[in-house]
Structures are given as structure tokens and as C-alpha cells.
């Protein structure tokens, strides 16, 4: 099984000053890791939950528990995503997430239901559970997205508690980065750790959510793909759902998740849809300044319960939960292998 941290370390930009919390590796380009035809799609009965990365597994388990207890899909997604948001050892989400270059922890999240209702927050500070605030945006406002101070004001009006999210461990790593990098915008080992979750519930309805603290040491005010409906997350209940992880700028440039769903609408399988959009991102970025450290991954789930994951580079894995095989991790297929 691929190790998520090893994978993230290999996305680091090696030409910049490297601190002790960073890792570097090269890659071997154009290595196609094509699966056998029968393994391209994993067909399942509903319900089914898939989410990105190892820390998606405890999120899945909590969501599954809530779903089996009769909670709504949105409530189940919220409950699951709150698990990594509250875990200080997950340095890419919520409490304990790595800060921006100013030492501020800023959070992004979104959530979407089967009726295409959605809520989102970005550049939110001081609130441990942005997924819950995003859900309140969906439920209690006429808007889709609230940002920055406005998102914070809304959260406080909804009864959320403001608190310091910068843990001593994350602060220590940030200060080390400042010292070693001389304030250069280094891509950090924990940069690409968005938790994205997709769900097909007992009634056959789709929903999804994303939560992240974004790119470590990012410029203050930077927002990635995760809170953007159509980039980090998209679903159409008649077709399927998709979500992204990786370098948000690349996903935004291609409206990644929306394009995966549109390809499924045209008859593509979840695997083929994820693969085609990943190839599109590669073709648009192969001569781009981001390319030497670019990594993106997608997960997709269609109305029939077929699911898949695919990434540009090796190491991406995702959690799957269903009644057939229980809770487990699966490795995504990929286009390019990293050198060892």
C-alpha cells in the first residue's frame, strides 16, 4: 500500500532551499501504469463512501456509522470530515493544519447534496470545523460561498467558537521553514492533502464534501480548488460525483471535478473520466513552471456505484467503505512513476 506521506514528499520542488521537514525526489516521466480491463471499475452496491488519503479512512468510518444510524447524507459527511479536522496530527486540515507564510492557519471547505444545493467557505480563520460552516452556508443562507472575515462573522453568528488553530508542532515547522527557505514559496510535504469525500447513499442519491488547510506556507489570502464547486468537488445526481486532491491551481485551471462528471455524462466510466482529465492537466502543464512538482489526483463515483481513482503521479490512495468488503484503502492508478 502506498504511503501518503512518502507520496507527498515526492511532490516537493527540489530546486528551492529545502528544510528538514521537506523531502525531494525526481520522477520518471511518461510511465503509464495501466490496469487490467476488469480492474478499471469497482462495481458496488449502495451505500458506498470513498474519500482521499489514509486519513480518509477514519472519516469514512464515522460517516458510515452516521449513515447506518439513519442520519442524512450531509450529516454523515459532516460527521466524518470533522474527524481529521479535529486531529492535530493531520497537518493539512483544520486544527493543526500548516499555516500560510504569515503563520496564519486559513481553512477552506465545501459540501454539496443530491439536489445541487451547496455551501462553501474559504480563507476562514479561527474555526476548527470549516465543513460545518460550509453546511450552514448551504442550509441558512441564499449564497454558495462566504470568504474570509465574512465567513468568520457568519460562523460566529451561527454559534461556532473562535479558537487558535496553530499547534506548537505546526508552528515549529513553520519557523523552521522561514529559517531555511529565506521566505521562498516552497512546496511542502503536506501540501496536497485535501480530504475529499463522495457518497452514494441507500436511496441512490449522491453527495460530497471537501476540507483542507491548503498549501503549507502559501501566500496569505491564497485559496485553492477545494472550496470551489466545479473544481475541487462536483456532482450531478443523474450522473455521478467527482473530487480532487493535489495542486489546486492546476485543478482550477481545468475545472477538474466538473469535467470528470461531464465525461461520465457522456458515457465514460469513472476510471476513464478521471484518467482523461488527468491527461488534460498534464498536456496543459507539461511546459508549465508548475510541472516539476505537479501532482493531482481524482476520485469519481457514478450513479451505479462504480468508482475509481487516478493520479498524475504515483502514491495516491483513497479509502472505500461499503457492505461488501467493509472499510479499506485502495491505490489509485497513475500516469507517471516517481524515481525511488
Q: What residue spans do the PLM features occupy?
A:
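Alpha/propeptide regions of enzymes that mature by internal proteolysis
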Residues: 2, 12, 16-17, 31-340
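Boundary at the C-terminal end of the N-terminal hydrophobic targeting segment
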Residues: 26-28
Amino acid at each position: 500500500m502506498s504511503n501518503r506521506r512518502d507520496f507527498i514528499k515526492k511532490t516537493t520542488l527540489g530546486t528551492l532551499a529545502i528544510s528538514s521537514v521537506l523531502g525531494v525526489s525526481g520522477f520518471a516521466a511518461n510511465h503509464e501504469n495501466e490496469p487490467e480491463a476488469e480492474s478499471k471499475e469497482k462495481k458496488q452496491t449502495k451505500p458506498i463512501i470513498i474519500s482521499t488519503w489514509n486519513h480518509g479512512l477514519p472519516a469514512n468510518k464515522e460517516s458510515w456509522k452516521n449513515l447506518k444510524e439513519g442520519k442524512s447524507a450531509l450529516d454523515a459527511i459532516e460527521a466524518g470530515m470533522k474527524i481529521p479536522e479535529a486531529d492535530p496530527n493531520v497537518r493539512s486540515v483544520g486544527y493543526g493544519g500548516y499555516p500560510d507564510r504569515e503563520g496564519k492557519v486559513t481553512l477552506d471547505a465545501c459540501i454539496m447534496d443530491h439536489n445541487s444545493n451547496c455551501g462553501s467557505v474559504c480563507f476562514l480563520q479561527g474555526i476548527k470545523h470549516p465543513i460545518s460552516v460550509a453546511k450552514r452556508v448551504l442550509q441558512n443562507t441564499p449564497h454558495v460561498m462566504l470568504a474570509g472575515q465574512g465567513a468568520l462573522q457568519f460562523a460566529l453568528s451561527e454559534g461556532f467558537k473562535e479558537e487558535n488553530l496553530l499547534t506548537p508542532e505546526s508552528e515549529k515547522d513553520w519557523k523552521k521553514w522561514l529559517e531555511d527557505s529565506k521566505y521562498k514559496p516552497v512546496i511542502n510535504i503536506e501540501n496536497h492533502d485535501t480530504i475529499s469525500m463522495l457518497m452514494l447513499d441507500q436511496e441512490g442519491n449522491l453527495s460530497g464534501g471537501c476540507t483542507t488547510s491548503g498549501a503549507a506556507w502559501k501566500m496569505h489570502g491564497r485559496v485553492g480548488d477545494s472550496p470551489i464547486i466545479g473544481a475541487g468537488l462536483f456532482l450531478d445526481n443523474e450522473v455521478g460525483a467527482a473530487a480532487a486532491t493535489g495542486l489546486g491551481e492546476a485543478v482550477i485551471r481545468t475545472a477538474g471535478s466538473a469535467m470528470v462528471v461531464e465525461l461520465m455524462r457522456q458515457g465514460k466510466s469513472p476510471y476513464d473520466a478521471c484518467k482523461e482529465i488527468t491527461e488534460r492537466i498534464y498536456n496543459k502543464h507539461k511546459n508549465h513552471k508548475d510541472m516539476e512538482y505537479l501532482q493531482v489526483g481524482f476520485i469519481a463515483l457514478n450513479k451505479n456505484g462504480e468508482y475509481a481513482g487516478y493520479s498524475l503521479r504515483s502514491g495516491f490512495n483513497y479509502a472505500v467503505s461499503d457492505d461488501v468488503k467493509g472499510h479499506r484503502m485502495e491505490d489509485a492508478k497513475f500516469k507517471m512513476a516517481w524515481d525511488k
